[in-house]
C-alpha cells in the first residue's frame, strides 16, 4: 500500500501509518518546512521505519510528487487543507497522484475551521473530480472521505 501524507510535520501520523502499511508499504510524507522533515527522518530512523518513508520538502506551489501520478492508494490531509494557499492546485496534485479508485481523507479541526469553510473545501474537491463517499466526524475534527473515480 502507498500512502501520501501532505503536511506531515514531524510525523505524528506518519510513523503509525508506516507501521500499518507493513514492510512492503510506502509513505510519501511531504512538508513545507525542512526542519519538520529533518525531525521526521530522525524519528523514523530511531523507530526503524525510515526504509518505508520517503520524506519530501516541498514548496507551496508544488508538492513535489508529480512523478508518482496514479501510484498512490490513499492520501491523508489531516488538519492541513485550511493552511494551503492554493487549495485547488493542492487538490489537483493529490488527485493526479492517486490511482483510479484511490481515496483522500480530509479532516479539519472543528475549533479552527467552521463547517461552512469545510463545505467549501469539499465542494472544491468535488470540482477537481473527487466523489464524496462518506462523512468523517471525530470529537475535534470533521471532514470527508473522497474517492478518485475508477
Where are these regions (language model features)?
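Conserved class I S-adenosyl-L-methionine
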Residues: 1-9
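Conserved SAM-binding strand-loop segment of SAM-dependent methyltransferases
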Residues: 49-60
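A short acidic, Gly/Pro-enriched loop at the edge of an enzyme's catalytic core
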Residues: 1, 61-75
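Conserved beta-strand signature within the Rossmann-like core of class I S-adenosyl-L-methionine
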Residues: 101-108
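A short glycine-rich, Lys/Arg-flanked "PGG" loop and its adjoining helix->strand segment in the class I
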Residues: 19, 88-100
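Conserved SAM-binding loop of SAM-dependent methyltransferases across substrates and taxa
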Residues: 10-22
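A short SAM/SAH-binding and catalytic strip from SAM-dependent methyltransferases
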Residues: 72-85
Amino acid at each position: 500500500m502507498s500512502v501520501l501524507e501532505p503536511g506531515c510535520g514531524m510525523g505524528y501520523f506518519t510513523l503509525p501509518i508506516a507501521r500499518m502499511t507493513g514492510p512492503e508499504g510506502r509513505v510519501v510524507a511531504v512538508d513545507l518546512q525542512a526542519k519538520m522533515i529533518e525531525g521526521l527522518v530522525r524519528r523514523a530512523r530511531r523507530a526503524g521505519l525510515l526504509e518505508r518513508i520517503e520524506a519530501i520538502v516541498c514548496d507551496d506551489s508544488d508538492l513535489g510528487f508529480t512523478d508518482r501520478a496514479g501510484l498512490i492508494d490513499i492520501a491523508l490531509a489531516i488538519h492541513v487543507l485550511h493552511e494551503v494557499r492554493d487549495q485547488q492546485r493542492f487538490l489537483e496534485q493529490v488527485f493526479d497522484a492517486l490511482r483510479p479508485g484511490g481515496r483522500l481523507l480530509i479532516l479539519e479541526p472543528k475549533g479552527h475551521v467552521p463547517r461552512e469553510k469545510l463545505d467549501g473545501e469539499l465542494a472544491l474537491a468535488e470540482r477537481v473530480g473527487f466523489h464524496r463517499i462518506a462523512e468523517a466526524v471525530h470529537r475535534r475534527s470533521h471532514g470527508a472521505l473522497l474517492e478518485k473515480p475508477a
